[in-house]
């Protein structure tokens, strides 16, 4: 299933894939909570911890994590007792790191390199839980098409869980010295927003940017 967007959307996805390929090594080098996951077989990532009580009992459930990046939260989902855990991400470099992390954590996780819009054709089976969180919505050119993918992955009675920033958060300009100002669009548009940044959202002294 492809998103309903401009013909240039393929180029946008490729730019985003390259961006996340570049970020993958930086994020792994930053720590990203990975050493704690490896050292403690019961550790749950701090990014997943707020969701644990809301997710309920996952023992024996099939779970898919969309836009999983390095898969640290995917490891956490496997530690909550899911019988099958799948992580999907656009970035091949992120998936490669995710597989290494899962192996170091002795976590049985299937990782699939695929555009989230192609997740239904890339992954077999259905899932009791489709999970995604933190910084996922802002990368999607077509929310309706994405929602249809999510629905297609759910087994009867399955649940979809998302935790992300409110869209209003992305409308506020970066310079807040004179208060909050709305500078970016709230609603979906046909063209992407672009930024040129020298670093990522983690601090990694000495790491490549």
Identify the residue ranges that each predicted region occupies.
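Residues lining the SAM
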Residues: 132-137, 163
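Class I SAM-dependent methyltransferase SAM/SAH-binding core
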Residues: 61-119
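A short His-aromatic
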Residues: 122, 138-139
């Amino acid at each position: 299933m492809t998103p309903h967007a401009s013909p240039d959307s393929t180029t946008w996805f490729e730019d985003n894939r390259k961006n996340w390929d570049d970020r993958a090594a930086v994020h792994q080098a930053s720590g990203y909570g990975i050493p704690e996951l490896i050292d403690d077989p019961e550790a749950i990532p701090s990014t997943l911890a707020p969701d644990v009580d809301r997710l309920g009992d996952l023992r024996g459930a099939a779970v898919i994590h969309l836009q999983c990046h390095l898969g640290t939260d995917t490891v956490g989902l496997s530690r909550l007792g899911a019988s099958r855990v799948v992580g999907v991400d656009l970035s091949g470099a992120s998936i490669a790191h995710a597989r290494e992390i899962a192996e170091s954590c002795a976590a049985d996780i299937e990782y699939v390199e695929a555009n989230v819009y192609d997740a239904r054709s890339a992954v077999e089976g259905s899932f009791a839980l489709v999970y995604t969180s933190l910084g996922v919505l802002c990368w999607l050119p077509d929310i309706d098409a994405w929602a249809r993918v999510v629905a297609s992955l759910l087994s009867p009675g399955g649940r979809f869980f998302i935790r992300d920033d409110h869209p209003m958060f992305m409308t506020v300009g970066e310079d807040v010295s004179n208060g909050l100002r709305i500078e970016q669009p709230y609603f979906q548009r046909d063209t992407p927003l672009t930024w040129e940044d020298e670093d990522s959202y983690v601090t990694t002294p000495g790491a490549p940017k």
